[in-house]
Amino acid sequence: MLTEKIVKRRKKETKILFFESNKEFSSDLLEEKYKDESNIYIVNDSAEYIGKYMKKYDIPWIDYIVSGLPFASLPNDLSSNILKKTQKYLKEDGKFITFKYTLLKKDFIKEYFSEVSVKREVRNVPPAYILCCSL
């Protein structure tokens, strides 16, 4: 549902990379669903390799990163690698937006950003937290 909203609200010239580590989901569902959409790239790989795909698809910087990664259950080194790459490639005025069902890793995420705001989304079941982060 989040993927659909992002696609629907984007400008046509906007390039979007969707990272999905589940091969069946990325190939069978996402690639098929968005095969006729220009500038949408489905990547079956870890988000920690974002630089490789930015180069491949000629994306010089990133305005927004929207993440549903379960940082609470990812190993710290993987989480750290992904957040370091986020710092590296996010535009100075860009935003990293992530949604969580727990705030367990909020302080960990805050280490990588100068500003982090938290909103609780009670319309989601279960309720979720949305962290909006700036460099």
How would you name each of these model-derived features?
Residues 1-13:
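Conserved SAM-binding loop of SAM-dependent methyltransferases across substrates and taxa
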Residues 17-19, 89-102:
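Conserved beta-strand signature within the Rossmann-like core of class I S-adenosyl-L-methionine
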Residues 19-21, 25-60:
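S-adenosyl-L-methionine
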Residues 59-77:
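A short SAM/SAH-binding and catalytic strip from SAM-dependent methyltransferases
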Residues 79-92:
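A short glycine-rich, Lys/Arg-flanked "PGG" loop and its adjoining helix->strand segment in the class I
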Residues 97-118:
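Conserved class I S-adenosyl-L-methionine
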Residues 120-135:
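Core SAM-dependent methyltransferase catalytic element
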